Amino acid sequence: MLSKEGIKRIALEVGFDACGVAPAEALTDSEYPLRRWLERGWHGNLDYMERNADKRMDPRLLVDGARSVICCVSAYPPPTYEGGVAAYARTREYHKVVKDMLFMLRERLGIPEAKVCCDTVPISDKHWAARAGLGWIGRHTLLVTPQWGSWVNLGELVTTEECDAYDSPLPTGCTDCNLCVEACPNHAIGEDMIDVRRCTAYYTTHRTREIPPDVDAHGYTQGCDICQLACPFNKTI
Protein backbone atom coordinates (compact mmCIF):
# COMPACT_ATOMS: atom_id res chain seq x y z
CA MET A 1 0.00 0.00 0.00
CA LEU A 2 1.25 3.45 -0.91
CA SER A 3 1.52 6.34 1.54
CA LYS A 4 -0.28 9.48 0.33
CA GLU A 5 2.09 11.77 2.18
CA GLY A 6 5.07 9.78 0.91
CA ILE A 7 3.83 10.15 -2.67
CA LYS A 8 3.47 13.90 -2.27
CA ARG A 9 6.91 14.30 -0.71
CA ILE A 10 8.62 12.39 -3.51
CA ALA A 11 6.58 14.22 -6.17
CA LEU A 12 7.97 17.52 -4.89
CA GLU A 13 11.48 16.05 -4.77
CA VAL A 14 11.39 15.07 -8.46
CA GLY A 15 10.28 18.57 -9.44
CA PHE A 16 6.49 18.81 -9.34
CA ASP A 17 4.85 21.77 -7.65
CA ALA A 18 1.89 19.85 -6.19
CA CYS A 19 0.46 16.35 -6.08
CA GLY A 20 -2.87 14.78 -5.15
CA VAL A 21 -4.20 11.23 -5.13
CA ALA A 22 -7.68 10.02 -6.06
CA PRO A 23 -9.27 6.57 -6.05
CA ALA A 24 -9.59 5.11 -9.55
CA GLU A 25 -13.34 5.35 -10.04
CA ALA A 26 -15.45 6.56 -12.94
CA LEU A 27 -15.93 10.28 -13.45
CA THR A 28 -19.55 11.39 -13.53
CA ASP A 29 -21.18 13.15 -16.47
CA SER A 30 -21.58 16.26 -14.33
CA GLU A 31 -17.84 16.26 -13.55
CA TYR A 32 -16.84 15.66 -17.16
CA PRO A 33 -19.58 16.37 -19.74
CA LEU A 34 -17.69 14.55 -22.49
CA ARG A 35 -20.69 12.78 -23.98
CA ARG A 36 -22.76 15.98 -24.16
CA TRP A 37 -19.83 17.82 -25.74
CA LEU A 38 -19.40 15.13 -28.39
CA GLU A 39 -23.13 14.92 -29.13
CA ARG A 40 -23.18 18.66 -29.86
CA GLY A 41 -20.26 18.36 -32.22
CA TRP A 42 -18.33 20.94 -30.23
CA HIS A 43 -15.16 18.87 -30.67
CA GLY A 44 -14.89 19.96 -34.31
CA ASN A 45 -12.69 17.55 -36.22
CA LEU A 46 -10.91 16.24 -33.12
CA ASP A 47 -12.11 12.76 -33.99
CA TYR A 48 -9.71 11.14 -31.53
CA MET A 49 -11.90 12.44 -28.70
CA GLU A 50 -14.65 10.11 -29.87
CA ARG A 51 -12.38 7.11 -29.54
CA ASN A 52 -11.94 5.46 -26.14
CA ALA A 53 -14.60 7.71 -24.61
CA ASP A 54 -15.32 5.11 -21.93
CA LYS A 55 -11.63 4.99 -20.97
CA ARG A 56 -11.60 8.77 -20.69
CA MET A 57 -14.35 8.49 -18.10
CA ASP A 58 -13.02 5.47 -16.17
CA PRO A 59 -9.28 4.76 -15.65
CA ARG A 60 -10.06 1.17 -14.71
CA LEU A 61 -10.80 0.61 -18.39
CA LEU A 62 -7.44 2.14 -19.26
CA VAL A 63 -5.43 0.13 -16.73
CA ASP A 64 -6.83 -3.22 -15.70
CA GLY A 65 -7.17 -3.36 -11.93
CA ALA A 66 -6.40 0.34 -11.43
CA ARG A 67 -6.95 1.50 -7.86
CA SER A 68 -5.29 4.91 -7.62
CA VAL A 69 -4.64 7.94 -9.82
CA ILE A 70 -1.63 10.00 -8.75
CA CYS A 71 -2.06 13.51 -10.18
CA CYS A 72 0.77 16.01 -10.47
CA VAL A 73 1.00 19.73 -11.23
CA SER A 74 3.87 21.56 -12.88
CA ALA A 75 3.36 25.34 -12.89
CA TYR A 76 4.73 27.59 -15.62
CA PRO A 77 5.24 31.38 -15.81
CA PRO A 78 2.25 33.48 -16.87
CA PRO A 79 2.60 35.56 -20.03
CA THR A 80 4.09 39.03 -19.85
CA TYR A 81 2.18 40.22 -22.91
CA GLU A 82 -0.91 39.21 -24.90
CA GLY A 83 -0.78 37.69 -28.37
CA GLY A 84 1.76 35.73 -30.36
CA VAL A 85 2.55 32.50 -28.52
CA ALA A 86 0.53 31.23 -25.54
CA ALA A 87 2.35 31.04 -22.21
CA TYR A 88 2.52 27.23 -22.07
CA ALA A 89 4.38 27.16 -25.41
CA ARG A 90 6.99 29.72 -24.30
CA THR A 91 8.63 27.23 -21.94
CA ARG A 92 10.28 23.83 -22.48
CA GLU A 93 8.14 21.24 -24.27
CA TYR A 94 5.88 20.27 -21.41
CA HIS A 95 5.13 16.72 -22.54
CA LYS A 96 8.79 15.79 -22.14
CA VAL A 97 9.27 17.73 -18.90
CA VAL A 98 6.19 16.27 -17.20
CA LYS A 99 6.73 12.74 -18.50
CA ASP A 100 10.36 12.71 -17.36
CA MET A 101 9.28 13.68 -13.85
CA LEU A 102 6.49 11.08 -13.89
CA PHE A 103 8.98 8.36 -14.85
CA MET A 104 11.23 9.44 -11.98
CA LEU A 105 8.28 9.44 -9.59
CA ARG A 106 7.20 5.99 -10.75
CA GLU A 107 10.71 4.64 -10.19
CA ARG A 108 11.05 6.24 -6.75
CA LEU A 109 7.67 4.84 -5.69
CA GLY A 110 8.56 1.35 -6.92
CA ILE A 111 5.46 0.96 -9.09
CA PRO A 112 6.85 0.01 -12.53
CA GLU A 113 3.43 -1.14 -13.73
CA ALA A 114 1.92 2.34 -13.34
CA LYS A 115 0.86 3.98 -16.59
CA VAL A 116 2.42 7.38 -17.30
CA CYS A 117 -0.16 9.85 -18.64
CA CYS A 118 0.37 13.35 -20.00
CA ASP A 119 -2.07 14.67 -22.59
CA THR A 120 -1.55 11.89 -25.16
CA VAL A 121 -3.27 9.09 -23.22
CA PRO A 122 -7.11 8.77 -23.21
CA ILE A 123 -7.59 10.17 -19.72
CA SER A 124 -8.65 13.70 -18.79
CA ASP A 125 -5.69 15.21 -16.96
CA LYS A 126 -7.61 18.24 -15.69
CA HIS A 127 -10.64 16.35 -14.43
CA TRP A 128 -8.49 13.90 -12.51
CA ALA A 129 -6.48 16.75 -11.02
CA ALA A 130 -9.78 18.23 -9.85
CA ARG A 131 -10.88 14.88 -8.42
CA ALA A 132 -7.55 14.73 -6.55
CA GLY A 133 -8.16 18.10 -4.87
CA LEU A 134 -5.59 20.12 -6.81
CA GLY A 135 -8.11 22.68 -8.07
CA TRP A 136 -11.44 22.92 -9.83
CA ILE A 137 -12.63 23.12 -13.42
CA GLY A 138 -13.22 26.74 -14.39
CA ARG A 139 -15.85 27.91 -16.82
CA HIS A 140 -13.12 28.01 -19.46
CA THR A 141 -12.85 24.23 -18.83
CA LEU A 142 -9.27 24.44 -17.56
CA LEU A 143 -8.06 23.39 -14.13
CA VAL A 144 -7.80 26.38 -11.79
CA THR A 145 -5.47 25.89 -8.84
CA PRO A 146 -5.59 28.12 -5.75
CA GLN A 147 -1.81 28.71 -5.96
CA TRP A 148 -1.06 29.14 -9.69
CA GLY A 149 -4.44 29.69 -11.29
CA SER A 150 -4.61 27.81 -14.58
CA TRP A 151 -0.95 28.35 -15.51
CA VAL A 152 -0.19 24.66 -14.97
CA ASN A 153 0.69 21.50 -16.87
CA LEU A 154 -0.63 18.18 -15.64
CA GLY A 155 0.22 14.50 -15.61
CA GLU A 156 -0.78 11.28 -13.86
CA LEU A 157 0.32 7.84 -12.83
CA VAL A 158 -2.49 5.28 -12.95
CA THR A 159 -1.54 2.41 -10.68
CA THR A 160 -2.98 -0.86 -9.40
CA GLU A 161 -1.63 -0.03 -5.95
CA GLU A 162 -3.99 1.20 -3.25
CA CYS A 163 -3.19 4.32 -1.23
CA ASP A 164 -3.59 4.64 2.53
CA ALA A 165 -5.65 7.82 2.08
CA TYR A 166 -7.10 9.89 -0.75
CA ASP A 167 -7.66 13.58 -1.37
CA SER A 168 -11.08 15.17 -1.76
CA PRO A 169 -12.18 17.60 -4.50
CA LEU A 170 -12.16 21.33 -3.74
CA PRO A 171 -15.28 23.49 -4.05
CA THR A 172 -15.33 25.72 -7.10
CA GLY A 173 -13.83 29.15 -6.71
CA CYS A 174 -15.65 30.55 -9.74
CA THR A 175 -19.00 31.10 -7.94
CA ASP A 176 -20.90 33.65 -10.09
CA CYS A 177 -17.86 34.89 -12.03
CA ASN A 178 -18.15 34.89 -15.84
CA LEU A 179 -15.11 36.96 -16.78
CA CYS A 180 -13.50 34.25 -18.91
CA VAL A 181 -16.78 33.67 -20.77
CA GLU A 182 -17.17 37.38 -21.46
CA ALA A 183 -13.53 37.82 -22.48
CA CYS A 184 -13.55 35.29 -25.32
CA PRO A 185 -13.76 37.32 -28.54
CA ASN A 186 -15.35 34.40 -30.37
CA HIS A 187 -17.94 33.37 -27.76
CA ALA A 188 -16.48 29.86 -27.64
CA ILE A 189 -17.36 29.21 -23.97
CA GLY A 190 -20.84 28.06 -23.06
CA GLU A 191 -22.44 25.84 -20.41
CA ASP A 192 -18.99 25.09 -18.93
CA MET A 193 -17.84 23.63 -22.24
CA ILE A 194 -15.76 24.90 -25.17
CA ASP A 195 -17.03 24.91 -28.72
CA VAL A 196 -13.63 24.38 -30.31
CA ARG A 197 -15.00 25.49 -33.67
CA ARG A 198 -15.04 29.02 -32.18
CA CYS A 199 -11.78 28.67 -30.20
CA THR A 200 -8.59 30.34 -31.43
CA ALA A 201 -6.37 27.75 -29.72
CA TYR A 202 -8.06 24.95 -31.66
CA TYR A 203 -6.91 26.44 -34.95
CA THR A 204 -3.49 27.71 -33.88
CA THR A 205 -2.53 24.51 -32.03
CA HIS A 206 -3.95 21.67 -34.12
CA ARG A 207 -3.62 23.45 -37.46
CA THR A 208 -5.94 21.00 -39.18
CA ARG A 209 -7.76 23.74 -41.07
CA GLU A 210 -7.61 27.44 -41.81
CA ILE A 211 -8.99 29.92 -39.28
CA PRO A 212 -12.48 30.91 -40.47
CA PRO A 213 -12.93 34.61 -41.26
CA ASP A 214 -15.46 34.98 -38.42
CA VAL A 215 -12.98 33.70 -35.79
CA ASP A 216 -10.71 36.44 -34.42
CA ALA A 217 -7.26 35.01 -33.58
CA HIS A 218 -6.47 38.24 -31.71
CA GLY A 219 -2.84 38.13 -32.79
CA TYR A 220 -2.15 34.59 -31.55
CA THR A 221 -0.12 32.23 -33.71
CA GLN A 222 0.23 29.38 -31.17
CA GLY A 223 -2.50 28.67 -28.63
CA CYS A 224 -4.45 31.47 -26.92
CA ASP A 225 -4.44 32.91 -23.39
CA ILE A 226 -7.37 35.34 -23.52
CA CYS A 227 -9.77 33.41 -21.27
CA GLN A 228 -6.97 32.69 -18.79
CA LEU A 229 -5.85 36.31 -18.67
CA ALA A 230 -9.38 37.28 -17.62
CA CYS A 231 -9.42 34.89 -14.65
CA PRO A 232 -9.01 36.59 -11.24
CA PHE A 233 -7.05 33.60 -9.95
CA ASN A 234 -4.47 34.20 -12.67
CA LYS A 235 -4.06 37.89 -11.87
CA THR A 236 -2.52 37.23 -8.46
CA ILE A 237 0.39 35.16 -9.78
How does the language model describe each region?
Residues M1-G173, D216-G219:
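Auxiliary alpha/beta "docking" domains used to position bulky ligands
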Residues P169-N178, P185:
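Long, well-ordered alpha-helical scaffolding segments within enzyme catalytic domains
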Residues A26, L179-I211, A217-I237:
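Iron-sulfur cluster-binding cysteine motifs and their immediate structural context
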